[in-house]
């Protein structure tokens, strides 16, 4: 393999932001934050959903906040988002 062209494959902590669950796995993800876990410092990747919070795995239905996404879409596209196409 060529030197210097492959991303850094390392242990990373992924933290589920909905319930605080953390797990360590190997990844090439680029992160800006670090976290100390078990006396060792790891890069931290924050995620919205994991197997600990996803309704498929937990068996509990959870309503996700989509209102913010809809408002952001409407602000971005304005009148075009009304569903009426100009002829």
Curated annotation (Swiss-Prot):
GO terms for cellular component: ribonucleoprotein complex; ribosome. InterPro entries: Ribosomal_bL28/bL31-like_sf, Ribosomal_bL31, Ribosomal_bL31_B, Ribosomal_bL31_sf. Transmembrane segments: none annotated. This is Large ribosomal subunit protein bL31B. One of its GO terms (biological process) is translation. It comes from the Bacteria. Keywords: Ribonucleoprotein, Ribosomal protein. Belongs to the bacterial ribosomal protein bL31 family. Type B subfamily. GO terms for molecular function: structural constituent of ribosome. Part of the 50S ribosomal subunit.
């Amino acid at each position: 393999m060529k030197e210097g062209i492959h991303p850094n494959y390392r242990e990373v902590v992924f933290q589920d932001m909905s319930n605080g669950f953390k797990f360590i796995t190997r990844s090439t993800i680029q992160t800006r934050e670090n976290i100390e876990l078990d006396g060792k410092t790891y890069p931290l990747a924050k995620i919205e959903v994991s197997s600990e919070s996803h309704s498929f795995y937990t068996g509990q239905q959870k309503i996700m906040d989509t209102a913010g996404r809809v408002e952001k879409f409407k602000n971005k596209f304005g009148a075009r988002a009304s569903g009426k196409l100009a002829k």
